[in-house]
């Protein structure tokens, strides 16, 4: 039967991509339906109980700046928070949190259930309704037909999912959940380019059977306690817990090597490629044979469970080998395994067949987000979900889409990498992937993106008011530092030596003083004159977030300005569109190889064309000349 209500957007899947997609579409004003095989698993953390990390934390902050759910849910569920790379520059500092799985899932579900314009419905999707080259809806396993202007598919690892433990395997979307085989078969019929990838998870341990006395404790940051959301507060966090560290050893490695003949990875049973930056323990032992040991982080899964996630020993080895390797680890000699580790192999679709909006090129109105695009990680999935959901809503409403640029957001880097370069292994975000990372910091994600989110309808009044106050306060304080001057009479020698290491001999602005390497904003605001009065303070010192933002903007102003100059030069051609119907065979000045690559990839802009492997700068120059001729010819014809 046809469901009586029609929708603007249907989102298929309730993982990290699907939930952000549904929330974004609904916030943008679209009548949105989220279809999931099980409402109880909305927002489920299928693998590790953590959010964030290098590059990943930047994505979470960007999702938050655009009104998304992940960061605030992490603040409500996080049981340990840390700033990684805290001793390095602000561009590569990243927030990471351990999360209570149940609290996180509950926080996401609460946001979904309280979001206007959003309906939830529990049914697995078996088919897509396609008329010509336009998607018009989805069909569930009991034959219900839901109609919509656009569909966002976020199927995760469920498409023809195959779970491996040793040489045994069975169909599944993840442990305990059925696969989406019918939907996977339907997508094959649509002849979208696809492949197989693999990921894995470690066995879970009963924490009561661990000897913590021989382990290294890893507490979270306490002064100050980090928060993820720009609207978050440390007071939102539940009780905090430590993690623990152990190490593999020669005995562990011997056990693993002895079981490789029964490993599905090394016996050829698994065809899919696994994630390079989150390898299985058997892959680590094989690839880094000269390494004597590897760290294993024992991470709590929640406040009301004894279950421990041993991060670093993801495996698909047979259970008897898993049993031995776990018991070879210091502190885990008597550990009780609650769940075996496994690998899962699944279908993904070549993201080069997507537009930069994450809409498929072949089928209008059909958007893909998350692991279906060849990525790995909750954060990468959430970011894609938000973008796909927003663009699906905009398209359904007849509005222009939004495509973030590489200089605007890590989300822009992520999408551009996917649609221009594709993937040969699960894609993970790193700060090193962003050429403009000094401008793409965690701390300024809201200053970069919240105004855009407001324009798209993604940002509510509460977030907008908080952002506006922060933006204005930072701008006013930066301007005050530039326009306030001090001289040797105002800043006496002893005070200057304490602050700067030497007396000043001429007049300086406060901004100039703050740019010096050893001067902090806090020290500058606390400096006093001979009369005991504050030289320049207190400024915004009472608000640590504002103080850090002001210090970063002032100290790195020169570097950021130079980077922005680079961006402006680059943008002159970066955004130049390439006609969708361009005949590359007519560009005879290009080599046959380059023409073939451009015909295969069909880049949307000159910037994308330049990033296609094998397309040289000389080829781009020739393509630009051809586009000028086309433009001149069309103008002449019109005249």
From Swiss-Prot:
Which GO molecular function terms does the record list?
A: flavin adenine dinucleotide binding
Q: Would the keyword DNA-binding turn up in this protein's UniProt record? A: no
Q: Which residues bind NAD(+)?
A: 274-288
Entry's localization field: Cytoplasm
Query: Per its UniProt record, what Gene3D superfamilies does this chain match?
Result: FAD/NAD(P)-binding domain, GidA associated domain, C-terminal subdomain, tRNA uridine 5-carboxymethylaminomethyl modification enzyme MnmG/GidA
Binding site residues for FAD: 13-18
Its Gene Ontology cellular component terms are:
cytosol
- Kindly list the cofactors needed: FAD
Which InterPro entries does the UniProt record give?
FAD/NAD-bd_sf, GIDA_C_N, MnmG, MnmG-rel, MnmG-rel_CS, MnmG_C, MnmG_C_subdom, MnmG_C_subdom_sf
- Record key words, sorted: Cytoplasm, FAD, Flavoprotein, NAD, tRNA processing
Question: Where the protein is mainly located, per its record?
Answer: cytoplasm
Q: What Pfam family is a match, any one? A: GIDA_C_1st
- PROSITE patterns linked: GIDA_1, GIDA_2
Q: Which GO terms describe its biological process?
A: tRNA methylation; tRNA wobble uridine modification
SUPFAM superfamilies (UniProt xref): FAD/NAD(P)-binding domain
Q: Which family does it belong to?
A: Belongs to the MnmG family.
NCBIfam families attached here?
Answer: mnmG_gidA (TIGR00136)
**Annotated function:** NAD-binding protein involved in the addition of a carboxymethylaminomethyl (cmnm) group at the wobble position (U34) of certain tRNAs, forming tRNA-cmnm(5)s(2)U34.
Q: How does it assemble?
A: Homodimer. Heterotetramer of two MnmE and two MnmG subunits.
PANTHER family from the xrefs?
GLUCOSE INHIBITED DIVISION PROTEIN A, PROTEIN MTO1 HOMOLOG, MITOCHONDRIAL
What protein is this chain from?
tRNA uridine 5-carboxymethylaminomethyl modification enzyme MnmG
